[in-house]
């Protein structure tokens, strides 16, 4: 087995570095758009193993990425908890906001078992993937998932969730712990179904002050890691606290994750320091892929120059956008694999 991404997570330097993209199965691909039409709703796509397998494999067939990431959504966890969830064109995910009293009635026992179609997708993808391709599972971090549950939709600064946490600290702590426990079970099931490693997406960690970051981001993720490792002691786990800034320092040590996913705002000088303590992943601005040309080439070259001589998985600093031209994605891959540093 020669899965380069796993070698990097374990701390090895592989050059040229392995590459995959967050949201690599997505709307920038015509084949994805066709499959999405067949599915009907977005949730039907997530919960239909045959279709979810197809979209997971599409970017592997087209680009030969070094990792495939399970096609699903971070909000299937609250959906399994019994919260309503729908996706509307142009509006993203919509939920009925949860209130403090409802949180105390949430039951976590057996919730992860309701996501069996996701695990079937993992099993089927692993059967069909090339042996050298790493299969990544994932979940949303409790803070990020909670922001959607409380506001009922995405917001620019997550003010509803922040205010809720200040006003109802006991309910909010229970919500984070419940989400951590269900998410841990969810990741354990994914690993059991054949995922090689898992990533925890904390897309909204950058809106918190230092104290709240510690309580709402660090502790719940550490709880997930601890519970996963109680079942799979060697589990490889990637943490992605997007927007954490200076608080990236110490995140790996405090949470127990193996590899740090970096957003594009992290200076490469700081990224290189973080790399001294272990593997990093990132961190090209997704809009450089949209722009192409020199903007793309210079961004790729800078990352390879500063971090190519250490354990690096090349990725974007967040998900690829639907506007990204396919030829620019190929240009990025060719440049990374060309190995300039």
Curated annotation (Swiss-Prot):
The record marks 73 as: Transition state stabilizer. Pathway: Porphyrin-containing compound metabolism; protoporphyrin-IX biosynthesis; coproporphyrinogen-III from 5-aminolevulinate: step 4/4. InterPro entries: UROD/MetE-like_sf, Uroporphyrinogen_deCO2ase_HemE, Uroporphyrinogen_deCOase. One of its GO terms (biological process) is protoporphyrinogen IX biosynthetic process from glutamate. It is found in: Cytoplasm. It holds the Pfam family URO-D. One of its GO terms (molecular function) is uroporphyrinogen decarboxylase activity. Substrate binds at residues 23-27, 42, 73, 148, 203, 318. The keyword Lyase applies. It comes from the Bacteria. Keywords: Cytoplasm, Decarboxylase, Lyase, Porphyrin biosynthesis. It is an enzyme of class 4 (lyase). Gene3D superfamilies: 3.20.20.210. Catalyzes the decarboxylation of four acetate groups of uroporphyrinogen-III to yield coproporphyrinogen-III. Homodimer. Belongs to the uroporphyrinogen decarboxylase family. PANTHER family: METHYLTETRAHYDROFOLATE:HOMOCYSTEINE METHYLTRANSFERASE RELATED (PTHR21091), UROPORPHYRINOGEN DECARBOXYLASE (PTHR21091:SF169). This is Uroporphyrinogen decarboxylase. It comes from Brucella suis biovar 1 (strain 1330). The gene is hemE.
